[in-house]
Amino acid sequence: MEISSDNPDHGFQFPGTFELSAMGTAERGLETELPRLLAATGVELLEESISWKHSSSGKYVSVRIGFRADTREQFDSAHQALREHPEVKWTL
């Protein structure tokens, strides 16, 4: 997913399309729960860009979610929702 600006010093540009990844314990339904959690923050999910991959041991799952945020506050709220989930070990 490409995020571009006419001035790289600007940082994130809003409204914009973004992607967050979260890794957590497998078999907890994070593949469906995390997209619902993000949608509840008010961002627009990009359903076609939701994907996940299980670790080789099957103990963890990485969930990648694309979304559109109109403001920095929406982006921060979405990221915070993932970080606060008790089964999420890290976000990116």
Curated annotation (Swiss-Prot):
Please give the superkingdom of this protein's source: Bacteria
Stated family: Belongs to the UPF0250 family.
Q: What is this protein called?
A: UPF0250 protein XCC3453
